[in-house]
């Protein structure tokens, strides 16, 4: 996919879908990838991808979201929608509604923070009140947190994961790489599988605590 600026690693295209199919075959895990165009949707459906997600820059463009929604008509597949890059709840809800109006029922939202010129602490400001309001507006919608994109630095992932759990998010999307420093994109926000396992085991999930 196109990066914020040209020149960075933008993926290998359709060839990568075959890799995901192999991962699914070897591990039995569901596989997921981002779609930004109707062509992406068609290729992913043809490859048997289990879950699709709409990226933050795409969510901010109703034209692109509608194109994706049209391509998904008549298809039953889970679709997750990231918040738009700008802090606009109506834009986020609008993207969810466009996909819902195409007949898809298995929808979820991903909170990955909002762009800001000031990046003193976070890569993307969490502005937790926005996903909290989304929960109030659409109570049954699963909402996941992406601490990797919010934090932008691996040392922030653990506390952001715990904060998301404290706010009753339904799950986490954390970037992991066997050798994070050698990752071709977003290396600073990735953790090894062992560190990810450690972070997850440390989480305190209040809904699971029996008093």
Outline where the language-model segments fall.
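Catalytic alpha/beta core domains of metabolic enzymes, predominantly
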Residues: 65-179
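Glycine-rich phosphate-binding active-site loops on the catalytic face of alpha/beta enzymes
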Residues: 54-60, 167-186
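Active-site mouth loops of central-metabolism enzymes
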Residues: 6-10, 30-34, 56, 148-156
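Glycine-rich, proline-tolerant flexible connector loops at the mouths of alpha/beta enzymes
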Residues: 1-15, 178-187
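Short, acidic/polar
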Residues: 36-42, 156-161
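Long, contiguous binding/interaction regions
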Residues: 15, 23-26
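Conserved small/polar residues in nucleotide/adenosyl-binding loops
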Residues: 209-211
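Short hydrophobic/aromatic-enriched beta-strand-loop microsegments
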Residues: 50-58, 79, 106
């Amino acid at each position: 996919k196109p990066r914020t600026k040209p020149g960075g690693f933008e993926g290998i295209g359709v060839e990568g879908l075959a890799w995901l199919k192999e991962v699914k075959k070897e591990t039995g895990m569901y596989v997921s990838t981002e779609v930004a165009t109707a062509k992406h949707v068609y290729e992913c459906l043809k490859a048997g991808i289990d879950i699709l997600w709409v990226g933050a820059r795409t969510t901010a463009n109703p034209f692109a979201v509608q194109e994706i929604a049209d391509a998904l008509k008549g298809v039953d597949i889970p679709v997750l929608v990231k918040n738009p890059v700008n802090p606009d709840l109506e834009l986020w809800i609008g993207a969810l509604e466009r996909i819902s109006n195409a007949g898809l029922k298995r929808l979820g939202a991903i909170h990955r923070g909002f762009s800001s010129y000031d990046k003193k602490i976070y890569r993307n400001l969490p502005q937790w009140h926005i996903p909290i309001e989304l929960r109030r507006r659409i109570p049954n919608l699963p909402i996941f947190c992406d601490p990797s994109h919010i934090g932008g630095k691996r040392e922030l992932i653990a506390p952001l994961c715990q904060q998301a759990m404290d706010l009753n998010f339904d799950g986490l999307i954390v970037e992991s790489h066997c050798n994070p420093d050698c990752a071709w994109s977003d290396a600073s926000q990735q953790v090894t599988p062992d560190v990810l396992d450690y972070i997850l085991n440390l989480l305190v999930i209040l809904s699971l605590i029996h008093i």
